[in-house]
Amino acid sequence: MYFMKNVITLIGLVLFSSFCFASEPLPWQMGFQPPASPIMEELHKFHDFLLYISTAIVLFVAGLLVFVCIKFNARNNPVPAKFSHNILIEIIWTVIPIIILVIIAVPSFRILRHAEKIPEADLTIKVVGYQWYWHYIYPDHNDIEFDSVMISDENLKPDQKRLLDVDNRIVIPENATVRFLITASDVIHSFAVPSLGFKIDAVPGRVNETWTRVAKKGVYYGQCSELCGINHGFMPIAIEVVSKEDFDNWVASKNKVAANGENSKLAAN
């Protein structure tokens, strides 16, 4: 009884820890991070749907191979068959894969359309990739802008995550539709946050866009996902989702800092 109690407690702790850190990659993780946006929820369901189809195909083909090897080996069939084709079988193995592909294509195109069609945004954020950090601009809020650089091991605090946390996070309100306008200044980067279901290339001279909407407060981590130089692995992305009130307070504090900076420049001149 005591042993079972410990086992149940251990399982509970593992599940709880997985829930707490659902917005980041975990050691020995299998599968996707838990979805945190509408697009990722659809991708998650589509992935599971494809897994069922793929498993059925693998089991069917493997079973067919075993059946053929047993039933049609040289011992059971000393005289081999002489026919060269079978029209019915050829029609079947052509039509069935087409049907399977159509079944896969319909939800796939629906998800692509949902991801590509940007809804009316409550907030727009410009994202610019540099070697090797991100620069963010909030054009709807007096052009708040700041660099976001990975926190080095020397400056890392106990509650911060190595190779994931940054000095300045993107901050967005919960349940808000956020549009990202993404480009780069030097080489090609890729703006990717797995739990939010987007991975968009940042290309110099070109603006790509995507969107998200997150209902749950927390911090969601990503990485640059396009090889962009020696420090490619040190370009994390951190998106903090807060309440509308906290977001307004954050905007006010950023604008205040910017205003104080401008006043300091004027006083110096």
Swiss-Prot record:
What is the uppermost EC class here? translocase
| Cofactor(s), by name | Cu cation; heme
Q: Where does the chain bind Cu cation?
A: 189, 224, 228, 232
Q: Name one GO biological process term.
A: ATP synthesis coupled electron transport
Question: Any idea which UniProt keywords this protein has?
Answer: Cell membrane, Copper, Electron transport, Heme, Iron, Membrane, Metal-binding, Respiratory chain, Translocase, Transmembrane, Transmembrane helix, Transport
Report the EC number(s), separated by commas if there are several.
7.1.1.9
Catalytic activity, per the record? 4 Fe(II)-[cytochrome c] + O2 + 8 H(+)(in) = 4 Fe(III)-[cytochrome c] + 2 H2O + 4 H(+)(out)
Decide whether keyword Amino-acid biosynthesis is in the record: no
Q: How does it sit in the membrane?
A: Multi-pass membrane protein
Signal peptide boundaries: none
Q: What Gene Ontology molecular-function terms does this entry list?
A: copper ion binding; cytochrome-c oxidase activity
Ranges that cross the membrane = 8-28, 50-70, 87-107
- Textual note on the cofactor: Binds a copper A center.
* Cell compartment(s), UniProt: Cell membrane
GO-annotated cellular components: plasma membrane
Q: Which PANTHER family match?
A: CYTOCHROME C OXIDASE SUBUNIT 2 (PTHR22888:SF9), CYTOCHROME C OXIDASE, SUBUNIT II (PTHR22888)
Q: Which family does it belong to?
A: Belongs to the cytochrome c oxidase subunit 2 family.
Q: Which NCBIfam families match?
A: CoxB
State the function annotated in the UniProt record: Subunits I and II form the functional core of the enzyme complex. Electrons originating in cytochrome c are transferred via heme a and Cu(A) to the binuclear center formed by heme a3 and Cu(B).
Instruction: Identify this protein by name.
Output: Probable cytochrome c oxidase subunit 2
- Species assigned in the record: Rickettsia bellii (strain RML369-C)
Q: What is the lineage of its organism?
A: Bacteria, Pseudomonadati, Pseudomonadota, Alphaproteobacteria, Rickettsiales
